[in-house]
Structures are given as C-alpha cells and as structure tokens.
Amino acid sequence: MKPTLKPSRVTIRAPTRSDCGAFLRAVRRSRALHDSWVSPPSTPKAFTRYLERFSSDTNLSFLIIHRSAGDIVGVINVGNLVRGALQSAYLGYYSFLPHAGRGLMRDGMLLVLRHAFRKLKLHRLEANIQPGNLRSIALVRKCGFVREGFSRRYLKICGRWADHERWAILAEDFGK
C-alpha cells in the first residue's frame, strides 16, 4: 500500500526544555498505554537526559504536535543514525492518550519519514516491534514498512529481554 501524505493534522518539531511539564503530564496520563512496551522519561531529570541524548547528529527526536489543540500527540525518535555506506537509522515511538488510535501518529510518522528521506538523505529506517504490539505493527504497515524478520530476545524493555519483529522502509519505497 502506498503511504500518502495529505494535509496533516499534526506538525513535528524537536523537543525543548519548555516541553517538560506537558510531556511529563502526557506520560502520566498514558502509563497504562505504555505498560510493557516502552519506558518514556517520567521525571524532570529523565526528561533532561532524554533531551541531551537526542540532541546529536546520530540521535534525533520529534514531538508530534496536534495542529489545532497544540497537545503532544506522541514522540518519534530517530536513533543510532549511521552515515557512510549504510545511511540508516532506527525508529522508536510512542503515542499519548487521549490521542492514541486516531491516526495522528500515522500522520506524524509520515512527516518524520519525509524528513528522514528527503532532508537527512537516509536510505533505510528500521523499527523493531514486539510481536504482541499490534497497534505498532499496524502503524508501520500503514506507513509502507515491510516485515523483514524476527529477532529473539532483541531488546531489554521494562527490565526484560523481549523478542521483536524487524520492519523497515527504504527511501525508494517511500512516496511511490
């Protein structure tokens, strides 16, 4: 299925220190949604570390912002960016309540993909997803990612090693 980018209900931007309060409130509101899938920063100190980690050339973060409400809808991180012959990065992402399940993360993901492929000139983006995370799998599938494989005990999530499916999208597949 060809992913299409329509006039978006969201914008993307880098997080700043001034986002800390709204971000932490969104994390608290969404604890049940994130349980066992992801551990977003949940304290001011953790938020500061997050900003420091994702302010380099190899790790970028984008807040997905609802255009009309101004709320933080979710986060998409572009991490471990490798240049040279690979031109690749890994994606990590999560949404916040009450916006989950409304297609806003899809809109945000398409904007991040466009930025990664057109502005950053990346060739490949990869998302590793726990097999039971059906919403996440549906998101990447709707954005044009292809399932490439399975990695046993791949990432330590919430204190335990978890299996993951490997999904990827190439620059030449985006926007065809």
Name the predicted role of every residue range.
Residues 29-32, 56:
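Short helix-loop boundary/capping segments at the starts of domains
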Residues 38-41, 58, 99:
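Residues at alpha-helix boundaries and short interhelical turns
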Residues 32-51:
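Conserved GNAT-fold acetyl-CoA-binding loop/helix
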Residues 50-53, 115:
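A generic secondary-structure signal
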Residues 52-63:
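A short helix-loop-beta-strand connector motif used in the catalytic cores of GNAT acetyltransferases and
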Residues 1-22, 26-29, 61, 65-176:
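Acyl-donor (CoA/ACP) binding surface of acyl/acetyltransferases
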